């Protein structure tokens, strides 16, 4: 298939919906005629040293099908949606040029939205400004920082909770770097539709008909992560000495709850319950976003033949119904 005829496809779904297994099923089904390379759409998988709590594909799995955008940042570093769009767009072109199909797989809906809809031309992260804001927050607290945000950017402050330190910090950073409120960047998109690498029409989604099915899988997976040494993984990250609870990496679901327990904010015995509850809330937000995308091709991930349905739909999209 000529490179310019190879589509880029996306597979999204809530956490624990079976995206990884489904992606391998797609790769196996297409491999005889069209190799597949996977681009991760996951804001946690970008971080090295965070393997168990992110359900990161194993080295063997990554060797089986080429993976991209995994282990590309240290947990001390930030990785923005704008950086993701830039990296994913480049990779889509490179993978097509190799005669392979780019399959974007994950559950970070902000990244998918930025890829499909375009992204505002906001200023990049500025480490020096961020450090000054963190020092200011240490002095006056995040409620004080929220009040400062309300002074310079009332619309953004109105939609953020006073404890949402990560987003408050980013909004203030944008203000200090650009002189413009974050809310002013939300009015227009700078990337024309014709320049975007793919559209939501290329999106396949895994969505459960029965939420109880997904909740059961979430609980099972969290307990399995704990049994696999997740807490030891968080202890190793803490032992570095340069990480803290307000970093984007340490605010990932599971890591945040483990860090809080290790800080003594909650009993360690409550970690499974709190981790599972936070994961369920994440899944709810992911499903809500997916249902706002009418162009998507939705597959019931709790159906007995979910994988067969997905593979058939992908085949039809790639080859127009050919086998």
From Swiss-Prot:
Pfam family of the protein (one): IPPT
GO molecular function (one): tRNA dimethylallyltransferase activity
UniProt xrefs under InterPro entries: Dimethylallyltransferase, IPT, P-loop_NTPase
Enzyme Commission number(s) of this protein: 2.5.1.75
SUPFAM superfamilies reported for this sequence: P-loop containing nucleoside triphosphate hydrolases
One GO process term, biological-process aspect: tRNA modification
Cofactor: Mg(2+)
Residue stretches spanning the membrane: none
Ranges where the record places region Interaction with substrate tRNA: 42-45, 166-170, 251-256, 284-291
Site (Interaction with substrate tRNA): 108, 130
Binding site for substrate: 15-20
Class in the EC hierarchy, top level: transferase
The keyword Transferase appears for this protein: yes
Keywords per UniProt: ATP-binding, Magnesium, Nucleotide-binding, Transferase, tRNA processing
Residues where ATP binds: 13-20
Reaction equations catalysed: adenosine(37) in tRNA + dimethylallyl diphosphate = N(6)-dimethylallyladenosine(37) in tRNA + diphosphate
Matching PANTHER family: TRNA DIMETHYLALLYLTRANSFERASE
Functional description taken from the UniProt entry: Catalyzes the transfer of a dimethylallyl group onto the adenine at position 37 in tRNAs that read codons beginning with uridine, leading to the formation of N6-(dimethylallyl)adenosine (i(6)A).
Assembly: Monomer.
Record-stated family: Belongs to the IPP transferase family.
NCBIfam families, alphabetized: miaA (TIGR00174)
Protein name according to UniProt: tRNA dimethylallyltransferase
Organism whose genome encodes this protein: Acidovorax ebreus (strain TPSY) (Diaphorobacter sp. (strain TPSY))
């Amino acid at each position: 298939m000529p490179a310019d005829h190879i589509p880029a496809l996306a597979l999204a779904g809530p956490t624990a919906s079976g995206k990884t297994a489904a992606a391998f099923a797609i790769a196996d089904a297409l491999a005889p005629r069209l190799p597949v390379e996977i681009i991760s759409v996951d804001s946690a998988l970008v971080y090295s040293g965070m393997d168990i709590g992110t359900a990161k594909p194993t080295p063997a799995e990554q060797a089986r099908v080429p993976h991209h955008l995994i282990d590309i940042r240290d947990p001390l570093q930030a990785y923005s949606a704008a950086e993701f769009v830039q990296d994913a767009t480049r990779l889509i072109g490179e993978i097509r040029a190799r005669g392979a199909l780019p399959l974007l797989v994950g559950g970070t809906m902000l990244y998918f939205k930025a890829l499909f809809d375009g992204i505002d031309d906001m200023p990049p992260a500025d480490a020096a400004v961020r450090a000054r804001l963190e020092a200011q927050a240490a002095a006056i607290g995040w409620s004080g920082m929220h009040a400062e945000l309300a002074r310079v950017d009332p619309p953004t402050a109105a939609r953020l909770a006073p404890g949402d330190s990560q987003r408050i910090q980013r909004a203030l950073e944008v203000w200090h770097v650009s002189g413009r409120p974050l809310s002013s960047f939300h009015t227009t998109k700078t990337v024309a539709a014709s320049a975007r690498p793919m559209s939501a029409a290329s999106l396949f989604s895994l969505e459960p008909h029965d939420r109880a099915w997904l909740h059961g899988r979430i609980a099972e997976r969290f307990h399995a992560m704990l049994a696999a040494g997740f807490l030891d993984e968080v202890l190793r990250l803490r032992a570095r000495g340069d990480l803290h609870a307000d970093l984007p990496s340490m605010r990932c679901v599971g890591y945040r709850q483990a860090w809080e327990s290790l800080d003594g904010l909650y009993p360690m015995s409550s970690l499974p319950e709190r981790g599972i509850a936070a994961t369920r809330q994440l899944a709810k937000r992911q499903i809500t976003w997916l249902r706002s995308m009418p162009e998507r091709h939705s597959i019931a991930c709790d159906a007995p033949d979910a994988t067969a349905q997905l593979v058939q739909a992908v085949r039809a999209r790639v080859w127009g119904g050919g086998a």
